[in-house]
């Protein structure tokens, strides 16, 4: 039996789509030196090659893909977006504006200089900034711009072409810049990280190991009584000295949870909770007494929960003010915008931050009620909220403003982005509303992006040879300029206008470019995870600004003549 692969794929859009995705994902795993191609560029390259062979796909799949992607971007940004926008993120907001704004202006200038159309210009901006949100925003605005069909088709094809030609240029140039730009300025990143660590009491170890606390019990002997010298637990400060916390005391057969006024007596049996290295720091007088193995004394349900910061008595306060250890709880991680932060007693908490806390189940629940709520550990998505806000986003995108002879539509990209932000924000404030497991959100976002990339590549592939020959050299130059010049401008602005610490500044710059591989290089150079503070500060707002940049470049283009 003979099977005509070409006829088979052309006659089945679903089969073609998944063939493109599978081949593209395989290609995306290849590495050029230390740089991995990535899923986006892998799918785009495969779809462009198949597009040259005149394979095509239904445009509805393309539209659904970009809608799912941009909506999920909004949901991820929502919990921290408003806290960054309105409060302590002024510097981060300004850095993101400078990065995105300068790239937009440079792209517009180069597009006019080289005589490109809006499709090539917007695609070049998206690729050079390695930003799919720019591509999504520009494509959606083009489709709703009222451009005549032949010109629209050409612009959309060129949009994909510009992105494909400059994506790797943007990625590689930024990674190289992240490696060498810190060496061209007079402040060493490692020194800057240590400086901010000393000022704020930060843990600079980028590879800090996290252990679960363990519980051990001891009988109080004469040496321990002598060591306490009649002081109560508050005066002894055992936690401050060792990191262990006395959770329970058995005295005369009665089990109790001690307060700070309790004084240890001969024959007491005490249960201490702490990390393994904290137990090793205990005074020898603890271990010289007999270790006790008693079911009732050791029967403690140690849990680890993720607590979402929500309540007013926690938002805007420093970690130290929560006094977690006074409540017998241990902080393992601080996560903001899916990014792990340094554990810093002086870090100011934002609404939507996630604290991973270990301790006795009752104590962890008490802490959670004080500062927010325990994140739901469920695999069930609130599909009703997902669909409802998706509909709201589409309806917002239909809004059009008329100014004299000029009309401006919000568009699906901006509408869905705004609706996603609102869903994410409300989820951070209401524990049972709009829950989407992070794994499910990642899957929908990634799948939507891959479907979108497959669609744009198949539609643009037929004209790639002509386009590559005409603008290939120009694209190389433009891609390098748009990728690196805004980074330099952003550095100068942050270093000499905002006077930011260099470790935080370089992290914030990589966040404004939403480039995780470059961020890893900055952290390695600083030998610290402190740059993650800056990265988290700009990442959420930059995703939103980049989407708006894709819309704005299409709106501004006709006004430039």
UniProtKB/Swiss-Prot annotation:
Annotated protein name in UniProt: Putative transport protein YbjL
PROSITE patterns the record matches: RCK_C
Topology versus the membrane: Multi-pass membrane protein
GO CC annotations, alphabetized: plasma membrane
NCBIfam families: PRK04972.1 (NF003440), YidE_YbjL_dupl (TIGR01625)
Record keywords, A-Z: Cell membrane, Membrane, Repeat, Transmembrane, Transmembrane helix, Transport
Coarse class of the protein's main subcellular location: membrane
Family, similarity comment: Belongs to the AAE transporter (TC 2.A.81) family. YbjL subfamily.
Start and end residues of each RCK C-terminal domain: 200-288, 292-373
Gene Ontology BP terms: potassium ion transport
MF (Gene Ontology): monoatomic cation transmembrane transporter activity
InterPro entries: AAE_transporter, RCK_C, RCK_C_sf, Transp_YbjL_put, YidE_YbjL
Transmembrane parts of this sequence: 8-28, 32-52, 66-86, 94-114, 158-178, 383-403, 406-426, 447-467, 475-495, 537-557
Domain of life: Bacteria
Organism of this sequence: Salmonella choleraesuis (strain SC-B67)
Keyword Cell membrane part of the UniProt annotation: yes
Compartments in which it is found: Cell membrane
Presence of the UniProt keyword NAD in the record: no
């Amino acid at each position: 039996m003979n099977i005509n692969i070409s006829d088979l794929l052309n006659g089945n859009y679903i089969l073609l789509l998944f063939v493109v995705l599978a081949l593209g994902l395989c290609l995306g795993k290849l590495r050029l030196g230390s740089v991995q191609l990535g899923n986006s560029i892998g799918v785009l390259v495969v779809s462009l090659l198949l597009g040259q062979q005149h394979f095509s796909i239904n445009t509805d799949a393309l539209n659904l893909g970009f809608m799912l992607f941009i909506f999920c971007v909004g949901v991820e940004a929502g919990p921290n977006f408003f806290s960054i926008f309105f409060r302590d993120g002024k510097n981060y907001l300004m850095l993101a504006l400078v990065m995105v704004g300068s790239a937009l202006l440079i792209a517009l200038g180069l597009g006019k200089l080289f005589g490109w159309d809006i499709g090539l210009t917007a695609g070049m901006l998206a690729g050079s900034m390695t930003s799919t949100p720019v591509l999504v925003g520009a494509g959606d605005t083009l489709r709703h711009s009222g451009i005549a069909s032949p010109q629209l088709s050409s612009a959309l094809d060129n949009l994909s072409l510009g992105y494909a030609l400059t994506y790797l240029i943007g990625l590689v140039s930024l990674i190289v810049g992240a490696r060498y730009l810190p060496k061209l300025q007079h402040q060493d990143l490692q020194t800057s990280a240590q400086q901010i660590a000393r000022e704020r009491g930060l843990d600079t170890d980028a590879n800090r190991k996290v252990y679960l606390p363990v519980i051990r019990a001891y009988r109080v002997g004469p040496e321990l009584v002598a060591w306490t010298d009649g002081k109560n637990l508050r005066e002894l400060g055992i936690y401050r000295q060792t990191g262990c916390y006395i959770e329970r005391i058995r005295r005369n057969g009665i089990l109790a949870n001690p307060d700070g006024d309790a004084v240890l007596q001969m024959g007491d049996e005490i249960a201490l909770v702490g990390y393994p290295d904290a137990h090793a720091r205990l005074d020898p007088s603890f271990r010289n007494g007999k270790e006790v193995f008693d079911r009732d004394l050791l029967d403690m349900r140690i849990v680890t929960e993720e607590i979402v910061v929500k309540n007013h008595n926690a938002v805007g306060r420093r970690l130290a003010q929560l006094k977690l250890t006074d409540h017998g709880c241990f902080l393992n991680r601080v996560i903001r915008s899916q990014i792990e932060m340094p554990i810093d007693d002086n870090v100011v908490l934002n609404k939507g931050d996630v604290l991973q806390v270990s301790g006795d189940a009752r104590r962890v629940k008490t802490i959670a009620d004080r500062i927010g709520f325990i994140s739901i550990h469920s695999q069930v998505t609130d599909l009703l909220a997902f669909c409802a806000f998706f509909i709201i986003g589409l309806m917002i995108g239909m809004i059009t403003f008329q100014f004299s002879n000029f009309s401006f539509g919000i568009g699906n990209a901006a509408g869905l982005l705004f609706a996603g932000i609102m869903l994410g924000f409300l989820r951070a404030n209401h524990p049972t509303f709009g829950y989407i497991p992070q794994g499910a959100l990642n899957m929908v976002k990634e799948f939507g992006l891959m479907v979108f990339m497959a669609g744009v590549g198949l539609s643009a592939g037929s004209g790639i040879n002509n386009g590559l020959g005409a603008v290939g050299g120009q694209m190389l130059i433009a891609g390098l300029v748009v990728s690196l010049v805004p980074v330099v401008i952003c550095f100068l602005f942050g270093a000499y206008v905002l006077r930011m610490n260099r470790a935080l500044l370089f992290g914030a710059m990589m966040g404004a470019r939403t480039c995780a591989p470059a961020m890893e290089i900055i952290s390695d150079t600083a030998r610290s995870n402190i740059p993650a503070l800056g990265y988290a500060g700009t990442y959420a707002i930059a995703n939103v600004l980049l989407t708006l940049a894709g819309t704005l470049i299409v709106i501004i283009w006709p006004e430039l003549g």
